[in-house]
């Protein structure tokens, strides 16, 4: 929707005005409030850019377009410019030692890792199609993310093939999963996700760190020790929760009340699923026992 000069001054310059120390002092008692703070993420652009420009025009009627320029120092300039349409263009002038971030494959891999399931569409270039034996760009935006991923949907809306397809998208080289558990709870904590029981290979270590942690569909990490019980870190899948503290040590994480509840909840859901298969489909349970026993034995230890 674009910004006015006053909004640029308020939202983009506020950290520069107050200084990093003042900013951190303001949020020292609520560190989680820093995450997602408007303007803070924007300033990380200077980690790779020697200069950043914002050319923006507000949606407000009669608004004047402006250009904000800064080289990463406390100094910046704001000037009036011409811009036909509303919205904002952010232009990064990449440092010489960060030119790798101009490579299409590098950008694509980073977007796929961190923005794959963002709730707003992210376009990277244009879609390509084959024409006369070669790939050519079309006029259609190449949207790289899925804004409504499987774990945000209700289980009643999904079929087995939907879960298997999602698993193949996450782990293209993996065998078909044994079964899965769809997590969806909003009280006393918020947690959604899908956990898959994989076919266990001979080297168990290679199977760890396959659970991806998200916060409101933003990728955080694939190291979930302390959140998921140790014996279940062999599982694959996705968990998404805004109630997991993201800026704390593992020891603090393990003492957090919400994390304890989430860990207990996941253990119970896995236990309930195994028990249901054992009671309702003993043949399937026995057929999959060689793959399942590692989880059960590890859990007993």
Question: PLM features: what roles do these ranges have?
Answer:
Residues 1-96, 100-101, 109, 116, ...:
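GHKL (Bergerat-fold) ATPase N-terminal catalytic module, capturing the glycine-rich phosphate-binding loop
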Residues 34, 52-75, 95-98, 105-301:
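GHKL/Bergerat-fold ATPase module in large chromosome/replication-associated machines
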């Amino acid at each position: 929707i674009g910004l006015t000069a006053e909004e640029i001054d308020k939202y983009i310059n506020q950290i520069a005005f107050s200084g990093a120390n003042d900013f951190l002092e303001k949020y020292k008692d609520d560190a989680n409030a820093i995450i997602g703070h408007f303007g803070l993420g924007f300033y990380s652009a200077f980690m790779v850019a020697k200069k950043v420009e914002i050319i923006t025009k507000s949606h407000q009627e009669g608004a004047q377009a402006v250009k904000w320029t800064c080289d990463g120092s406390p100094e910046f300039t704001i000037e009036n410019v011409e811009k036909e349409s509303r919205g904002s263009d952010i232009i990064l002038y990449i440092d010489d030692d960060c030119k790798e971030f101009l490579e299409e494959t590098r950008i694509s891999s980073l977007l796929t890792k961190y923005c794959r399931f963002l709730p707003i569409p992210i376009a990277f270039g244009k879609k390509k199609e084959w024409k006369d034996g070669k790939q050519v760009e079309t006029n259609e935006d190449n949207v790289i993310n899925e804004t409504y991923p499987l774990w945000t949907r209700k289980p009643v809306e999904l079929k087995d093939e939907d879960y298997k397809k999602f698993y193949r998208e996450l782990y293209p080289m993996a065998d078909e999963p044994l079964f899965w558990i769809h997590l969806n709870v909003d009280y006393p904590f918020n947690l959604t996700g899908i956990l898959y029981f994989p076919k266990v290979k001979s080297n168990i270590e290679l199977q760890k760190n396959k659970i991806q942690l998200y916060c409101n569909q933003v990728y955080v990490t694939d190291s979930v020790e302390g959140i998921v019980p140790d014996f279940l870190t062999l599982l694959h899948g996705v968990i998404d929760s805004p109630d997991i503290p993201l800026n704390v040590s593992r020891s603090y994480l393990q003492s957090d009340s919400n994390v304890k509840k989430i860990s207990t909840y996941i253990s119970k859901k896995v236990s309930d699923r195994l028990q249901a298969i054992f009671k309702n489909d003993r043949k399937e349970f026995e057929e999959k026992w060689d793959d399942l026993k590692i989880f059960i034995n590890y859990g007993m230890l």
